[in-house]
Amino acid sequence: MALLEICCYSMECALTAQQNGADRVELCAAPKEGGLTPSLGVLKSVRQWVTIPVHPIIRPRGGDFCYSDGEFAAILEDVRTVRELGFPGLVTGVLDVDGNVDMPRMEKIMAAAGPLAVTFHRAFDMCANPLNTLSNLAELGIARVLTSGQKSDALQGLSKIMELIAHRDAPIIMAGAGVRAENLHHFLDAGVLEVHSSAGAWQASPMRYRNQGLSMSSDAHADEYSRYVVDGAAVAEMKGIIERHQAK
């Protein structure tokens, strides 16, 4: 049966995902940045309360995946922390200036991760040569690759995803970006073994007093009084679709 991973940005969201049938959680901070490394407090809380597998993302900033020496040092430290806390896996990725896997740095990450299952995240979708990159990741011992097939969403990239799945010695290929209940059957029918979804919605802040005259964000038009949360009903719906597809 296909595995359902839910992207979560808080302990509450991780618990919602777990309660509604998620098989695994990718734990992140900063949804507007596409996911950054969670704080130590969030990591410890989730480790204590969430029982399904949780893979934290290790990404020190938004933007590209070519990091300075200082940023890479922070990545290695975060990898060691996640390992010490007892998480079963993590999510990360590093590219060089030419859009290839930065093999020396990824080798250091794999050594620091030890027995943890490492997912190479959507840095893959920014690489120059996906098939060569897939071979490099297999050589590194990467467990899985999260990809939209190098398109803006995974449905548009499904043909590329299927090409990657068919590649010899490929890691597990997990489809992600825009995967929802209404299009999930396309991925299941194509034989995709793992799918990744935010299954989320914007939730209004409970604050009654709102100072509309300023913003805490660099984006002056950002909505300060809403947050992105996992929709439990959406997770349950996706899990039900997977189970019914398996029963066919």
From Swiss-Prot:
One GO term describing the cellular component: cytoplasm
GO molecular function, one term: copper ion binding
Subcellular location: Cytoplasm
SUPFAM superfamilies linked: CutC-like
Keyword Ribonucleoprotein among UniProt keywords: no
Pfam families, per database record: CutC
UniProt-listed InterPro entries: CutC-like, CutC-like_dom_sf
Keywords annotated in UniProt: Cytoplasm
Signal peptide from the UniProt entry: none
Oligomer status and interactors: Homodimer.
NCBIfam families, A to Z: PRK11572.1
Family: Belongs to the CutC family.
Name by which UniProt lists this protein: PF03932 family protein CutC
Organism: Shigella boydii serotype 4 (strain Sb227)
Annotated gene: cutC
